[in-house]
């Protein structure tokens, strides 16, 4: 039986506020699609994570008398902890502040720049 590769991702959730029902809903719907594809024998990868850049995060941190990094760490942890509580089967959780994410983005942008695009 031939397997097909499938890649599923939620939006990377913005950490300016705590997770809510909409985040849970999106994660569950994506999880259903990923599980179905695994059941069909497809090589399936399911990614989710958090976007930790932007003025709204700085503003939320300032309102709570903390740094944007400390605030993002706290809220990102809430998003990550939401997943097992909902039995979400994601393969990875990425944070836009993580070194591995930064390295990949730099590599992609360098390739684009070098190709003249």
Give short role names for the model-derived ranges:
Residues 1-117:
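N-terminal, positively charged nucleic-acid-binding surface of large information/translation enzymes
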């Amino acid at each position: 039986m031939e397997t097909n590769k499938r890649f599923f991702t939620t939006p990377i959730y913005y950490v300016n506020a705590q997770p809510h029902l909409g985040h849970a809903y999106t994660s569950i719907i994506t999880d259903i699609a990923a599980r179905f594809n695994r059941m069909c024998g497809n090589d399936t990868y399911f990614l989710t994570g958090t976007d930790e850049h932007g003025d709204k995060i700085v503003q939320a941190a300032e309102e709570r008398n903390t740094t944007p990094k400390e605030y993002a760490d706290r809220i990102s942890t809430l998003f990550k902890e939401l997943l097992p509580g909902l039995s979400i089967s994601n393969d990875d959780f990425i944070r836009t502040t993580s070194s591995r994410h930064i390295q990949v983005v730099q590599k992609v942008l360098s390739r684009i720049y070098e190709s003249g695009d």
